[in-house]
Amino acid sequence: AIHFVPELEEERVDHITYQELYVRVNEMAALLRDFAGLKRGDRVTLHLPMSAELPITMLALARLGVIHSQVFGGFSGKAAADRIVDSGSRVLITMDAYYRGGKLLDHKVKSNQACDKAAEDGQKVDKVLIWQRYAGKYSADTPLVDGRDFIVNDELKNYYGARIDPEWMNAEDPLFLMYTSGTTGKPKGCQHGTGGYLAYATGTSKYVQDIHPEDVYWCMADIGWITGHSYIVYGPLSLCASSVIYEGIPNYPDPGRPWRIAQNLDVNIFHTAPTAIRALRKIGPDEPAKYNYKFKHMTTVGEPIEPEVWKWYYNVVGKKQAAIVDTWWQTETGGFLCSTLPGISPMKPGSAGMA
């Protein structure tokens, strides 16, 4: 189901099967229900970095009918506080630390900042649940707050083997909140429902991205954005594919890292943004040719892609074999609105739609 790739290359890749995912989601759901006291209709803010624990937590909350609101891991404690206050969350779920550019960053400090700022604005956080980057070891310098902060890995021991019946939801019941980036003012919370969103994320994953159960699919986006929700978690997993989650930056420790990951995991569907494509082209224009991978399909998303960048993406990254789908959509839509269809629509460099 999930291949979690740590940023440090010497650390092992965590291969999580669908059975293992089912077990871990159920155990986390039991903890969230019985320890955190969460129930259907509650809102919970997540401030997690790219990790296997992020989709596990999202799916556990969804199993309980609890509305999740994930904040991009790179955002500040204040940004998390704004979303805690707006959503009325009384539980925050985070991680102690994560790697970025080879450095282990203290992420726990942001939860303290978020809780303090939220309290100033009238929203008290009752519990902060903290996943450990290394199970059994606390990796942050920021101390825990007694009575409020709890280590998920420790508490999970009380729920091993637990099974939780999923909450039956109506199609229009909320599944999650996704806040816009706030580039045009205060971040706005977009609420996505259960039935329509899942149907659309699944349908576009299948027909636009050509995802099948045997595929290994890698979207380089962050789950903190709508692209990650729809096309790392909900879409690929609903189609029984294998979804790659990478912890760090694509050029660590060198520009060949993405293509080594693709080679080692047999990735055959690749999904990224023009900004990343431009960066990879600049720092390692000849790197893809050094690695033995084969993409059948490549997506570009998030912004227009210049024709010359598109051509490098097709010729060098795709090795003139992969179909490119250029897409346009919004946080509010939950899935692709404008795109070509692989193998059906002609491709045109820089065009997100019919050529």
Task: Go through each PLM region and give its residues.
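Conserved pre-ATP/AMP-binding loop-to-beta segment of ANL
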Residues: V125-G136, P143-Y179, K186, G196, ...
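Conserved AMP-binding/adenylate-forming core of the ANL superfamily
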Residues: I2-L59, S76-A81, I151-E155, H192-G195
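Structural core segment of the AMP-binding/adenylate-forming
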Residues: R63-D154, N264-D266, A273-P274
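ATP-dependent adenylate-forming carboxylate-activation enzymes
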Residues: L48-P49, S69-V85, A97-R100, D106, ...
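Conserved adenylation A10 loop of the ANL superfamily
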Residues: E9-E10, L177-G189, S205
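Conserved helix-loop-beta element of the AMP-binding
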Residues: R90-V91, V109-L129, D215-Y217, V244, ...
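Conserved AMP-binding/adenylation subdomain of ANL enzymes
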Residues: G65, L198-V216, I226-I269, K282-P285
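Gly/Ser/Thr-rich phosphate-binding loop
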Residues: F150, N268-T272, R281-P349
